[in-house]
């Protein structure tokens, strides 16, 4: 039996009942939407707590029936037969409740900004960056998320030197946040006549999309410069100054957007700047919570080599959790659930270990 915090469970049950009552009595109030949101957040954990409470009571009743000599023999035999199944159900429910009670990452339900940059490996690295972007696009499509391109710098032989996109939908950041880091590819390039395997890499950064309420950017802390945007070969895209560079003076973070619309460039640049500042705050908070207590999966170290995609062997290996899958073709088509679920599970295990200390 897992020792669960009964006081915390009782508080949640009490709060849920209070919200139900307030929603029923004030269906047209301004606070209804806020109450409905909290109701939705608590619904799953409260449902599991109630299910667990009922199952525990059922187990107690069955054990009493089994041990009561005055009970009919057939009923005692039935109780004896049913009890192990109920106990197994309780075990599963306790694990589910334990995970649902873990501290929530405030950014989990946010949309994300996905940044992929070609690393070592030249032309092949840019091609791989393109492959990774398509992989995430397909994964997003399977999840019903929306992917919108923010900016892209194409590679000389295809793919991307850098590509930035927003990913919007339910639980986006919770699923993608463990993708940050260095992704390495081992394969024979199409241009390689000798059939030698080349190794190249791309860096992925997944940032939670920040809102004004998450991070405040003061006007005096930013410098905005406009420049002429030039396309491939150096020609001017148009005759107006459209490229925008925003510099956050206190941190030195610089964001450049060079699409055709200056107004859109400024909005996009502010969106990315806000996300990077919010991400910086989260990274700082993680560090302050003590390096030794952070789970390896959740460290978000962008310089850490997290995954290798080996094409000749048809395998993908996530080095943080020592997981190897021999279905590289499916992974590249966006079949990421097994990897993502394993990373989330490992992170939850680390959180449980932390709470136990």
UniProtKB/Swiss-Prot annotation:
Q: Which residue stretches does the UniProt record annotate as biased composition, category Basic and acidic residues?
A: 282-294
Do you know which Gene3D superfamilies this protein is assigned to? 3.30.160.20, 3.30.70.1660, 6.10.140.1950
Q: Which GO terms describe its cellular component?
A: cytoplasm
Q: Which UniProt keywords apply?
A: Cytoplasm, Methylation, Protein biosynthesis
Enumerate the GO terms in the molecular function aspect.
translation release factor activity, codon specific
Q: Which domain of life is it from?
A: Bacteria
Q: Which residues form the signal peptide?
A: none
Q: Quick one: where is this thing mainly located? A: cytoplasm
Location(s) in or outside the cell: Cytoplasm
SUPFAM superfamilies tied to this protein: Release factor
Chain positions covered by the region annotation Disordered: 282-308
What protein family is recorded? Belongs to the prokaryotic/mitochondrial release factor family.
NCBIfam families assigned to the protein according to its UniProt record, in alphabetical order? prfA, PRK00591.1
Its protein name is Peptide chain release factor 1
Give the source species.
Answer: Brucella anthropi (strain ATCC 49188 / DSM 6882 / CCUG 24695 / JCM 21032 / LMG 3331 / NBRC 15819 / NCTC 12168 / Alc 37) (Ochrobactrum anthropi)
Annotated gene: prfA
């Amino acid at each position: 039996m897992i020792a669960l915090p009964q006081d915390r469970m009782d508080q949640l049950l009490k709060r849920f009942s209070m919200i139900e009552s307030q929603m029923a009595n004030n269906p047209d109030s301004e606070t209804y939407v806020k109450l409905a949101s909290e109701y939705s957040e608590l619904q799953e954990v409260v449902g599991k707590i109630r299910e667990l409470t009922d199952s525990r009571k059922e187990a107690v009743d069955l054990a009493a029936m089994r041990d009561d000599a005055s009970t009919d023999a057939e009923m005692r035999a039935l109780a004896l037969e049913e009890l192990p199944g109920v106990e197994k159900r309780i075990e599963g429910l306790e694990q589910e409740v334990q995970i649902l009670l873990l501290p929530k990452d405030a950014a989990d339900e946010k949309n994300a900004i996905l940044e992929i940059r070609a690393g070592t490996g030249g032309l092949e690295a840019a091609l791989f960056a393109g492959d990774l972007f398509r992989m995430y696009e397909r994964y997003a499509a399977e999840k019903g998320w929306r992917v919108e391109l923010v900016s892209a710098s194409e590679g000389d032989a295809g793919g991307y030197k850098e590509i930035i996109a927003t990913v919007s939908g339910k639980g986006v950041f919770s699923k993608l946040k463990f993708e940050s880091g260095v992704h390495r590819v081992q394969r024979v390039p199409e241009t390689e006549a000798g059939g030698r395997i080349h190794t190249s890499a791309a860096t992925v950064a997944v940032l939670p999309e920040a809102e004004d309420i998450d991070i405040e950017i003061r006007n005096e802390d930013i410098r905005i410069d406009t420049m002429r945007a030039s396309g491939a070969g150096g020609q001017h895209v148009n005759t107006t100054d459209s490229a925008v560079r925003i510099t956050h003076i206190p941190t030195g973070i610089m964001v450049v957007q060079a699409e055709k619309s200056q107004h859109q460039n400024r909005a996009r640049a502010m969106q990315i700047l806000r996300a990077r500042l919010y991400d910086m705050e989260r990274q700082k908070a993680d560090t302050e919570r003590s390096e030794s207590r952070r789970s390896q999966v959740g460290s978000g170290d962008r310089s850490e080599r997290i995954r290798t995609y080996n094409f000749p062997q048809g395998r993908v290996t996530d080095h943080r959790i020592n997981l190897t899958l021999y279905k590289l073709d499916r992974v590249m088509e966006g079949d990421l659930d097994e990897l993502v679920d394993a990373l989330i599970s490992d992170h939850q295990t680390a959180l449980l270990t932390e709470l136990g200390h």
